[in-house]
Regions:
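Acidic/histidine-rich, metal-coordinating catalytic segments
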Residues: 1-9
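An anionic, glycine-rich sequence signature occurring as long contiguous blocks
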Residues: 24-137
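Short amphipathic alpha-helical "interface-anchor" segments enriched in bulky aromatics
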Residues: 119-167
């Protein structure tokens, strides 16, 4: 079983809990403030291209394993931290924590098999779940429009059904995409 989570799941307590249950995980990881120092220690040849969902190299996005550079005291043994660097898209707002023009994001995993590219692609696929949540909110889950609890409970079921219909129709109609 694999548990995937965004940055909210990247805590010592949660990863220890998952490790104690012998569950594989891939969770967002908050990089420390001194990340630029670590970034500059990584030679250019260490970075490998990130992949698109179709398995092709994504231009301008690279991956490196920062596990040996970070202080991971208190984190579960065997945890790896994989960093993705990517140039922000044209027009994107730059952030204070961008390093040398790259936006750095990271995730932690206890999976030992697979390339950095495979692990990062697997982690990024959690975005489908986040997309389904966004669709559910757009479909009507963002607000409960009725006054009674039972009425809103029925409303939530209707929204869930509509979200399922949207997901299935997209999978069936756009199977090759």
């Amino acid at each position: 079983m694999l548990i995937r989570a965004d940055g909210a799941g990247g805590t010592k307590e949660f990863t220890k809990w998952l490790t104690g249950r012998r569950v594989a995980y891939s969770v967002g990881f908050t990089l420390p403030m001194d990340t630029p120092d670590f970034y500059h220690l990584v030679p250019e040849w260490v970075w490998v291209p990130a992949l698109n969902s179709d398995g092709e190299a994504r231009e301008g996005a690279d991956l490196a394993d920062f596990t040996g550079l970070l202080d991971l005291d208190g984190w579960p043994a065997g945890m790896r931290v994989i960093v993705r660097r990517e140039r922000p898209h044209p027009g994107a707002q730059l952030r204070f924590d961008d390093v040398d023009g790259y936006r750095l994001t990271a995730f932690a995993t206890n999976t030992t098999l697979g390339t950095l590219q495979q692990l990062e692609l697997r982690h990024r696929r959690r975005a489908r779940c986040e997309d389904r949540i966004r669709i559910a909110k757009d479909t009507g889950l963002a607000n409960l429009p009725l006054h009674g609890f039972d009425q809103n409970r029925i409303w939530c079921q209707i929204v869930a059904l509509a979200s399922e219909l949207q997901a299935w129709s997209a999978m069936l109609a756009l199977a090759g995409h």
